[in-house]
């Protein structure tokens, strides 16, 4: 059984939808979301790649993008959304209802990370 956040092939096979916010024609925030897998009766979606330009952080751009991704996944029959945020990004995810589901771990150059999820 593959665990959320540990299946590298899942991300390679994904067909993500990207969403961004522009200010004065400059991309200032971006994220992606995609269907990742089903387990039992639940369809899981992943949020991946949240980025907000440093000059625009702290202005709720991440909340707007995450809310859009959550609503999009729900319209596509998603039941849960999960993510592997770095420590500095977890507050943005919590602001829209994600709950930390794991301890912190090092997984590459952007850690520490954890697994967080939200029921749609």
Predicted features along the sequence, with ranges:
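Short amphipathic alpha-helix that is part of the acyltransferase structural core
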Residues: 1-28
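Conserved beta-strand in the GNAT
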Residues: 20, 26-36, 44-51
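A conserved beta-turn-beta hairpin within the catalytic core of GNAT-like acetyltransferases
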Residues: 36-48, 57, 110-112
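Conserved acetyl-CoA pyrophosphate-binding loop and the N-cap/start of the following alpha-helix
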Residues: 56-68
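Conserved GNAT acetyl-CoA-binding A-motif
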Residues: 73-86
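Conserved catalytic-core motifs of GNAT/GCN5-like acyltransferases
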Residues: 84, 99-117
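Short alpha-helical
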Residues: 87-91
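Conserved active-site tyrosine of GNAT-family acetyltransferases
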Residues: 93-94, 98
């Amino acid at each position: 059984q593959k665990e959320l956040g540990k299946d590298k092939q899942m991300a390679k096979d994904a067909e993500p939808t990207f969403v961004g916010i522009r200010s004065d024609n400059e991309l200032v925030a971006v994220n992606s979301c995609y269907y990742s897998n089903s387990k039992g009766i639940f369809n899981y979606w992943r949020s991946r790649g949240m980025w907000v330009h440093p000059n625009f952080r702290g202005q709720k751009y991440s909340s707007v993008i995450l809310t859009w991704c959550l609503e999009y996944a729900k319209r596509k029959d998603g039941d849960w959304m999960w993510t592997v945020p770095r420590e500095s990004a977890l507050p943005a995810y919590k602001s829209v209802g994600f709950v930390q589901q794991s301890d912190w771990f090092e997984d590459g150059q952007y850690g520490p990370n954890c697994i967080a999820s939200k029921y749609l």
